[in-house]
């Protein structure tokens, strides 16, 4: 069977265009791939179109809108999740319109499908006292406690996203003045973030203890789990929640949900308040 035009464009979009031309992160590519998996299943199970027979001309506005309604109704997707799925489809059809000009009108009609408005949750931030209590919880007498102490300190000090923290390697760290870490952010954009003196000392001790200050270790994970691998998102959330739970027993004001993004927002608010 001859490949359909839809299969050719989806494959090129996911395996070549996003990574080679747009320099999109592997996590974003995976998220986009998941959207097409859902779309193919919807076309097969709801629309009765087998994946191997799905053609580009069949992906019209009515089908995309039906797919988005299906996500909300059958899969109970939140409006924000629906919008993320739509953003992936918008990226694909923005690519297709330049590859297949005779499909430009079809693509632009899909690009005109609006994002759904929804209330955005307010992200709180911690007082300096609450933050200090959390950062004081790791037990510096244990190896794991020392790792947690520097991890939490960097999470706050740099305002790093969780994935940025996961991706850190010793080669991204500069301990000599001006001390800083190099973070790979969204859109594969690199930025250098300065470090406070206390964080620098914690980080220096961590790297020396784990022999990460040697040149041959510069591509290794800066923070590792018990299997000597990079920490996962759930692993970092677990570490944070463990120490937040202990801090709550000492400070009644810590009665809110604290996530890694809370520390990122806290850093921004502290900088703002300090002028």
List each model region and its residues.
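Conserved catalytic core of the tyrosine transesterase superfamily
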Residues: 1-275
């Amino acid at each position: 069977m001859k490949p359909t035009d839809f299969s050719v464009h989806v494959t090129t979009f996911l395996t070549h265009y996003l990574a080679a031309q747009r320099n999109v992160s592997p996590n974003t590519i995976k998220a986009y791939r998941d959207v097409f998996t859902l779309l193919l299943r919807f076309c097969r199970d709801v629309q009765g179109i087998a994946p191997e027979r799905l053609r580009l001309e069949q992906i019209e506005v009515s089908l995309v809108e039906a797919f988005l309604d299906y996500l909300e109704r059958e899969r109970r997707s939140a409006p924000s999740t629906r919008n993320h799925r739509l953003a992936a489809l918008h990226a694909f059809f923005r690519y297709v319109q330049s590859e297949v000009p005779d499909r430009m009108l079809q693509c632009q009609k899909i690009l005109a499908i609006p994002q759904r408005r929804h209330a955005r949750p307010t992200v709180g931030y911690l007082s300096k006292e609450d933050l200090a209590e959390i950062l004081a919880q790791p037990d510096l007498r244990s190896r794991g406690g020392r790792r947690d102490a520097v991890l939490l300190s960097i999470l706050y000090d740099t305002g790093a996203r969780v994935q940025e923290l996961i991706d850190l390697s010793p080669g991204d760290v500069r301990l000599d003045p001006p001390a800083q870490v190099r973070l790979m952010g969204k859109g594969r954009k690199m930025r250098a973030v300065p470090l406070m003196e206390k964080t620098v000392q914690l980080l220096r001790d961590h790297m020396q203890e784990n022999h990460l200050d040697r040149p041959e270790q510069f591509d290794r994970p800066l923070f590792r789990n018990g299997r000597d691998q990079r920490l996962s998102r759930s692993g970092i959330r677990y570490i944070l929640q463990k120490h937040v739970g202990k801090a709550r027993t000492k400070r009644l004001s810590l009665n809110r949900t604290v996530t890694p993004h809370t520390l990122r927002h806290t850093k921004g608010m502290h900088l703002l308040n300090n002028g």
